[in-house]
């Protein structure tokens, strides 16, 4: 088992989070919060893509209220370990960097902190992927209820030039 840490840097700004799996039950039970309604046509489009690819190829971006101990563990790990992968996108000027946590005790500590201190996460990007996955789960009862997502502290999830909580589809 492993967790990946993920940092996106652009200019002088950056945001860092955890790439992990989330249980679709958390979405269905409202522990993964949505802030906008979805469009049936886009859900249908997402469903066709998921079925044809047999996968969701883009992770969902979730935010959570910052927990200082989680932030401290992430920062310490990054400072003490080399990244296993880094790629710069010239067109956007973004540098994407990944670290892998394989220390079982650290993974367990992070999981415990999320369980104890993060009562809900919030969808920043991926409402249609979440709603479509939920619909497919309810209709098809897949064997694996988990999907990839990126978890970022809300304080770090402000993307320049983009509102984090648009209500365009309410």
Protein language model annotation of sequence segments:
Residues 1-170:
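Surface-exposed, charge/polar-rich loops and edge strands
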């Amino acid at each position: 088992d492993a967790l990946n840490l993920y940092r996106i840097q652009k200019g002088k700004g950056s945001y860092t989070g955890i790439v992990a799996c989330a249980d679709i039950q958390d979405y269905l039970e409202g522990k993964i919060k949505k802030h906008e309604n979805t469009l049936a046509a886009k859900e249908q489009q997402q469903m066709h893509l998921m079925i044809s690819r047999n996968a969701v190829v883009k992770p969902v971006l979730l935010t959570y209220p910052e927990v200082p101990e989680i932030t401290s563990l992430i920062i310490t790990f990054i400072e003490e370990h080399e990244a296993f992968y880094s790629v710069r996108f010239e067109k956007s000027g973004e540098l994407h960097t990944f670290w892998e946590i394989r220390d079982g005790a650290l993974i367990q500590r992070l999981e415990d902190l999320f369980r104890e201190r993060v009562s809900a996460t919030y969808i920043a990007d991926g409402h249609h992927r979440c709603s479509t996955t939920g619909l497919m789960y309810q209709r098809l009862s897949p064997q694996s209820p988990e999907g990839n997502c990126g978890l970022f502290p809300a304080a770090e999830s402000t993307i320049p030039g983009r509102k984090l909580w648009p209500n365009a589809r309410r």
